[in-house]
Amino acid sequence: MQISALTITIKDEARKQIYLQILSDQFCMGIISSIIDDPKTAVEIAKTTSIPISTVYRRLQFLQENKVLKTSGGLNKDGKYFVYLSKLKSASTHFDGSEIWVSVTPNLNFTIN
């Protein structure tokens, strides 16, 4: 069975600005790119992207606040841990001369709130 991707055009101006901010931030894009297919911890994200860990934590907080990440956690011998997975599969922008259009494709079965 094939899951077809649904592309959503963002109409809310505040939400559109958030996506434009995410798309223009190299660290947000690096983080999202690293967790599209496989969930990772903040430390794993920092290692795979070479983004400083403090920057990873700040951007993860921003992405969580804006509902772009699925977060789950658990306990292991070292204590609590959280893993992050992008709710975005892809995003695109288009300028038609008078308006900017932002479209997003959710990752798997995640919905963008």
Feature names for model-found ranges:
Residues 2-29:
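Short alpha-helical segments that sit at the start of domains
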Residues 26-28, 37-41:
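Short capping segments at the starts of secondary-structure elements
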Residues 44-50:
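A short acidic, leucine-rich amphipathic alpha-helix
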Residues 47, 64-65:
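Alpha-helical residues within the helix-turn-helix
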Residues 67, 73:
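Glycine-centered, phosphate/nucleic-acid-interacting loop/turn motifs that mediate DNA/RNA or nucleotide
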Residues 77-113:
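Conserved segment of winged-helix/HTH DNA-binding domains
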